[in-house]
């Protein structure tokens, strides 16, 4: 288990990169550190690797304090964004290099290098130089080199940033499969939320040097703790609708741009104590039902445009100052929505029990306050 407690990192000039990071990572887990540029994810990884000395806090591996240990004493393998291969060495020598440093016999280190190359399906490339390989092949070599010494912890620092979309999916699948087979405790740094959700068992979302939420992809997507997490997870991003909680004829309602609509039954109890509170309704494109503008309980919106994505339509519509995206599964309605968009006609949406509700001032998820 890796245990990080109160990790702080301050650079010259008073810049705080990490402001109290706390994490527990179980043996065999695959963790993603996710967030925008400058949030502290790579700094956290480099502290774990021993490439940076934190200002304060501790890092433990299996109860052993490794905070101030040299990188070579941590039994860690690391895969970098730039591959960091030796251009003058053959692939097999690049892979075997960590074993050579450990003074492993030549026959054994080549044997282990070949076996690792076979796992990543690059055994036919062993006699080539890095310059003769594609980006995806070079990344596989870098992964082999990191894993050949059988590390206890495997770190990935944005390993797919230099790859095109198709290669990203390929390498993503390779990483996921390899980690599942070896069960090496692994941590990946990425700014791509789809990448993190596809690979990781749990994801830590960072912003301004702090962990905003550390949970499974499902929980982060369905139950974000605040507006930052809600906006960061999902493509398209979560929609936000400004509202106020009011008492209506049938019970608790949202007041949206002068319209009074009922709060979905499954959310009414949790919001009962929030009367007159200014909130933002958080709803994903597929978590609302498109209906006619005059439907009972619907929010009326003005249609701005429609995109045909093949498997669905993505309708953009506006209510007040909020532009939202609505998923429409019936692609035969493209002409209908296109017609509405041309004249800025109205449609309606019905909110479902899947909505989240955030306090407009604190940005916290009101549904998680209990």
Residue ranges of predicted features:
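Conserved ABC transporter NBD signature motif
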Residues: 57-65
């Amino acid at each position: 288990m890796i245990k990080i407690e109160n990790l702080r990192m301050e650079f010259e000039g008073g810049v705080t990169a990490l402001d109290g990071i706390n994490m527990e990572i179980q043996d065999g887990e695959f963790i993603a550190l996710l967030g925008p540029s400058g949030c502290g994810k790579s700094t956290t990884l480099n502290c774990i690797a021993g490439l940076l000395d934190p200002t304060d806090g501790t890092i433990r591996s299996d109860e052993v304090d490794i905070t101030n240990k040299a990188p070579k004493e941590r039994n860690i393998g690391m895969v970098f964004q730039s591959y960091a291969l030796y251009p003058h060495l053959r692939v097999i020598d690049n892979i075997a290099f960590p074993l050579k440093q450990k003074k492993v016999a030549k026959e054994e280190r080549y044997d282990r290098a070949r076996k690792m190359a076979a796992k990543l399906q690059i055994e036919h490339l062993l006699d080539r130089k890095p310059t003769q390989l594609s980006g995806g092949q070079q990344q596989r070599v870098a992964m082999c080199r990191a894993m050949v010494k059988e590390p206890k912890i495997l770190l990935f620092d944005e390993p797919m940033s230099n790859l095109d979309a198709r290669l990203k999916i390929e390498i993503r699948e390779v990483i996921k499969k390899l980690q599942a087979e070896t069960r090496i405790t692994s941590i990946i740094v990425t700014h791509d939320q789809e990448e993190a959700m596809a690979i990781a068992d749990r994801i830590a979302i960072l912003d301004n040097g702090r962990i905003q939420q550390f949970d499974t992809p499902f929980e982060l997507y369905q139950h974000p703790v605040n507006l930052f997490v809600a906006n960061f997870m999902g493509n398209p991003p979560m929609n936000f609708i400004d509202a106020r909680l009011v008492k209506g004829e049938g019970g608790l309602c949202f007041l949206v741009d002068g319209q009074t609509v009922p709060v979905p039954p499954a959310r009414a109890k949790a919001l009962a104590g929030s009367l007159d509170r200014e909130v933002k309704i958080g709803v994903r494109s597929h978590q609302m039902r498109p209906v006619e503008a005059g439907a009972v309980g619907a929010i009326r919106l003005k249609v701005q445009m429609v995109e045909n994505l093949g498997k669905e339509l993505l309708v953009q519509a506006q209510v007040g100052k909020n532009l939202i995206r609505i998923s429409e599964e019936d692609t035969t309605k493209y002409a209908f929505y296109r017609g509405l968009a041309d004249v800025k006609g109205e449609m309606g949406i019905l909110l479902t029990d899947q909505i989240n509700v955030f306090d407009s001032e604190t940005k916290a998820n009101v549904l998680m306050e209990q």
